Amino acid sequence: MATTIDQAFVRQFEREVHASYQRMGSKLRQTVRSKGDVKGASTVFQKVGKGIAATKSRNAQVPVMDLVHDNETCYLEDYYAGDWIDKLDELKTNIDERQVIANAGAYALGRKTDELIIRELDKSTNYAGDDATGLDLEKVLEAFEALGEKDVPDDGQRYAVVGWKQWTELLAVKEFASADYVGADELPFRGTQAKKWLGTMWIPHSGLTLGAGDVRLCHWYHKSAIGHAAGSDVETDISWHGDRAAHFVNNMMSQGAVIIDPDGVVTMRCDETPA
């Protein structure tokens, strides 16, 4: 077995990992503000307050809104997803096998991306309803109202991420699952990855925090409320280790997340205790 790896193969494998990460690795990265190619260990997301328009008299100065300018710092950390491969030469000739290994690394990095975003969403203290019930229409409408009261834009960039238990509970809500309310094109049965309802893209996710008392933290938020930053795209390093007679494939990525505007996040605490 060769102990050196052709660099063209390494670059091709790296591209496959990156493509898999972009396509399937993270469910939530596209739902938040995202920065790429960040230089250094941190970056800043700007936040601007609300402005109020006013009149002015003839020849008077235009009134100044005195907007409050604030920012949130996002700190990046390095994350790795590596594995040992005894027969790397097989990857060069077996496309299916190579894609399996590439996907494994990409999905691991994608899960970490979602974990970072969820960790920031969990900082929300804007709760809709109590934590003694599951996800029902009443709790959904209370969260919807809370977003409106905070003037969160209803501009097509709202997202709601819920657990699979809550997704099945929503399927029992006729306003969510019936074509009479949402139209045939928006029925959740056409695809379980996401569904639009109440001007919001609803996404089921298996990685949401399950806290004490089997309470799942589900979140409804605006894209601008959470920031994600990446220092670089997915990188891959392949090295030979003679003591193991194997190659080590390491996929790595520098990234971080931060909550920018807590008012843009409403959390629905949902009880998953068996009835």
Model-derived regions: residue spans:
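Extended, compositionally biased alpha-helical segments that mediate assembly or anchoring
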Residues: 238-275
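Alpha-helical scaffold segments that mediate packing/assembly in large oligomeric complexes
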Residues: 86-152, 267-275
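N-terminal "assembly arms/tails" that initiate or stabilize quaternary assembly
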Residues: 1-74, 265-273
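Extended, solvent-exposed, turn-rich assembly/linker loops in the middle of proteins
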Residues: 123-193
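Short helix/loop capping segments that flank catalytic or ligand/cofactor-binding pockets
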Residues: 53-56, 169-172, 258-260
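Short acidic, glycine/tyrosine-flanked loop/strand segments centered on an H-E-D-like triad
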Residues: 69-91
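Glycine/small-residue-rich hydrophobic helix-like segments
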Residues: 191-240
